[in-house]
Amino acid sequence: MKKLMTLALAAAMMLGAATGANAIDFKAKGQWIMDFNYGMHGDFAKSKAAGNSGFSRNGNHEDEFEATQRVRLQLDAVASEALSGTVFFEIGDQVWGDNDNGGALGADGKFVELKRAYIDWMVPQTDLKVRMGIQGIALPSFTTNASQILDDDVAAVSLNYQFNENVGLTAFWARPYNDNYGYTKQVAGAKPYENYMDNMDMFAVLLPLSFDGVKVTPWVMYAAMGPGMFGPDKYGASWSAASKGMQSGFKGTDWNDSYGNAFWAGVTGEVTYWDPFRIAWDVNYGSAAYADEKMNREGWLASLLLEYKLDWGTPGLYGWYSTGDDNNPRNGSERMPTVSANGNNDFSNFAFNGNPYIAREDVLGSTMVGTWGIGARLKDVSFLEDLKHTLRVNFMGGTNAPKMAKYVSDYTAYDKRGVEAVTGGGFGYDPIYLTTEDYALEVGLTNTYKMYDNFTVMLDAAYLALWLDNSRSTWGKNAMSTWTAKRYSPSTGWKTRKGAASSERC
């Protein structure tokens, strides 16, 4: 009966598509990016050839100079104001000359990816908007314009309702992970076992409030995680953003049988009442708890932005602070848990994940968790038509206890500490672990020229200096102290890039 019902439904959908085809309005848009990068010391290695391989960073090995391209194509099928469907493809990133991604001579690489695919519809006789499918989901942020907890594409059902011009409501259910570990698994010759609980489900509610000169959005999010979500064969895999951001990095003997519950809450907003003066803030809290308490993670992150818009540009001051690990590895981590921060951080486009195009970025990490910082910027400075410049200077440091540095090393299973290294399996390390004795300085200049309405040329240059404390109270007792002293005492990374983009922005 179920099969017959399925066939009937499919036939009805096909018939509807056939009879209503003339009423569908198809709209296409896209983005073409050509990028040319040159940089050195992406892993902060010194200049000696033996310790420096191109622009290695975050486990990626790149040449000092590389040319890259990416194409994004979006197709919208609009039946009415109440019903539409969208599919969004991405081709790339393709490194010129790289056969694995279709950039070598002859091309013909199989490198087309599905980025988003969803339908939008409205509940009849109401203003309730529903989006179902793989879509972009982001928690709110008024300072960085990119959530440090969740900002990425994910399979979800989202609801949006506007009560009046001042009050709205947004809710979603998202499933970032499921069925990645398999239903039957055998590890190291042991007896095969079944594994059904490898999913992660997130539920969130946001309440956007907008008044004259003031916007505030309080929000909450809960996530349930199955014990099979962190299976051993997924360590360091491409989907492992959650394993880096949701665990402490330490674990005991029952880590693979630990159900998890996570909770986040935040208040973000801005005041533009005294325009052109603007104040923006983000306050976020999060915790992730497991049956294995060593895996727990709990912390908060707050940021503040002050800026004043002038005719020629917008100068601004900003700062942030995030809790870091204390000196006890057995009580979990005091860093705020994160799911995937894949947005464009306005505070930094080199140290963190902030560049809107293809670029070398997140050299310190994809999020600001476990760090503090202050910065100044001149944004969108323009003295010539269609030419803009943005200058950033950031000074930052870590908030993790110096004692924790000795755990950033390899690990012998089930040693007397009963904990794994903070970098175990790629967990909890994104990618540089900064203590309260470690500091970094970033200087960046971004130049954009709008040559035509849909064609922009960008020239971007950035420099990052890192100082790690190699005394015995911090990294000197680390098992890798010789390695860190050679590579991080102190050193710098830098890049320069030129990019061209033609688009209706996707």
Where are these regions (language model features)?
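A conserved hydrophobic secondary-structure block that centers on an alpha-helix together
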Residues: F142-T144
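Long, well-ordered mid-to-C-terminal structural blocks that present hydrophobic/aromatic surfaces
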Residues: K294-N342
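Glycine- and aromatic-enriched membrane alpha-helices
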Residues: N349-F350
